[in-house]
């Protein structure tokens, strides 16, 4: 009977837990555990997992090593048609709640650096926008909060993919931006990124554009080559790469013009 239940658990996604409980396969990896908690809309347990991880590392590393790979897996499942649209929305809302929980704890132990209330979108000149869906938006939210944690940059919440539609509601934000970060989970093609970069450039003609291909397995691919393929100023495949690229872009923005 046990063998039968294990076999069923391996082949019926809804009964996967039977294989985990009764089988002899290793327990879930940290990424799989996080994926399951977020999919179950359990940001509290996801928060606890992040806090436990950060005791020996940092929240940035948790976002990089656990959350981004989980989002990449979710996008792959969505591409295969096994992650319903409503689950994509759950991923975004649960990760947003987790980040809010984590930042509340961070702020409680640190001296206040900002006035209370929401950060005005575009205050820093940096704008983050999702390329396709809620998963890209969740990844953009992770980048935004890494910038807040590590660079103390006042940056508003990322815009949804709707901001790149024909609707002009967000045009003023783009026009004021000096850096625009386009967030895409790695399964997106350079051709799609190139199309979205063109849209951004029309909305933000003076901005430098960074494309984040989060969770990309091809880290050995030269960033310059990917940037050429997308017509962006920079491409990053990790949050730390993105922060370094934004540092470089901002330093160029602030550099005094040379005197001839």
Which ranges hold each PLM region?
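Peripheral docking tails and interdomain loops at the edges
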Residues: 208-260
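Non-transmembrane accessory domains of multi-pass membrane transporters/channels
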Residues: 20-86, 99
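Short helix-loop-beta junction
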Residues: 141-157, 202
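Conserved, well-folded catalytic cores of nucleic-acid-processing
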Residues: 7-11, 15, 98-101, 105, ...
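Short hydrophobic/Thr-rich beta-strand motif most characteristic of the beta2 strand and flanking loop
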Residues: 154-161, 236
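Cofactor-cradling patches in redox/metallo enzymes
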Residues: 162-224
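Hydrophobic alpha-helical transmembrane segments of membrane transport and translocation systems
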Residues: 1-30
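Long amphipathic N-terminal alpha/beta scaffold segment
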Residues: 67-140
């Amino acid at each position: 009977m046990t063998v039968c239940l294990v076999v069923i658990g391996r082949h019926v996604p809804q009964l996967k837990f039977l294989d985990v409980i009764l089988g002899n396969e290793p327990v879930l990896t940290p990424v799989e555990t996080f994926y399951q908690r977020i999919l179950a809309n359990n940001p509290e347990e996801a928060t606890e997992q992040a806090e436990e991880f950060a005791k020996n590392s940092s929240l940035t590393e948790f976002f990089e090593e656990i959350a981004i790979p989980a989002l990449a897996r979710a996008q792959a499942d969505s591409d295969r048609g096994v992650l319903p649209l409503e689950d994509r929305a759950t991923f975004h809302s649960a990760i947003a709640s987790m980040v809010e929980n984590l930042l509340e704890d961070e702020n409680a132990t640190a001296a206040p650096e900002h006035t209370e209330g929401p950060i005005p979108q575009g205050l820093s000149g940096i704008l983050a926008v999702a390329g396709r869906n809620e998963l890209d938006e969740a990844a953009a939210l992770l980048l935004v909060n890494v910038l807040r944690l590590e660079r103390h940059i006042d940056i508003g919440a990322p815009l949804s993919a709707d901001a790149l539609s024909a609707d002009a509601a967000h045009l003023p934000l783009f026009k004021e931006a000096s850096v625009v970060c386009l967030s895409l989970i790695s399964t997106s093609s350079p051709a799609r990124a190139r199309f979205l970069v063109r849209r951004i450039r029309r909305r933000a003609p003076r901005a430098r554009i960074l494309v984040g291909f989060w969770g990309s397995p091809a880290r050995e691919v030269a960033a310059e080559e990917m940037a050429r393929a997308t017509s962006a100023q920079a491409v990053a495949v990790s949050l730390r790469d993105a922060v370094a690229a934004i540092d470089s872009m901002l330093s160029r923005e602030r550099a005094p013009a040379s005197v001839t």
